[in-house]
Amino acid sequence: MCIRDRSHTIDESFDITSRTLNMVFDQLDENNVSLQGIVLKPNMILSGYSCSYQASIEEVAEKTVNCLSVHVPSEVPGIAFLSGGQSDEHATLHLNEMNKYETDWNLTFSYGRALQQSALKTWSGKIENVTDAQEAFIEKAKANSLATVAGL
């Protein structure tokens, strides 16, 4: 799929992701994989960091849901998004906006850095910051949990 630090447009991201999803599901079908037993972990449809036009939260959500609607079979029970180098705030807002759409799947998150970044920054390796870091992590986890039901 697209590498985030490039200059591709959101439309190029859509096209590349579409082709990739088609190949993935062709291979899953060819190998008789039960789609009811998978969780898809795709990227969101984003502009590259170096692209002069950065898509809005709403545009990212619309393009991502549209791409998935066309290329992901309804038998897939869930889609867990990677943050793909987005800021923790953008990853959460994009997920929230996508969950405003009616889809065939549960849309959730599988974030590493985007879930942990604020806690790690708050902690900064100092024992006296542990409680504040834990609170920052819980706050981010709650926000992403709310985003799975468009609750922000």
Where are the regions a protein language model picked out?
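Short, small-residue-biased leader/transition segments that mark boundaries at the very start
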Residues: M1-I3
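Active-site capping/gating regions of soluble enzymes
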Residues: H8-L152
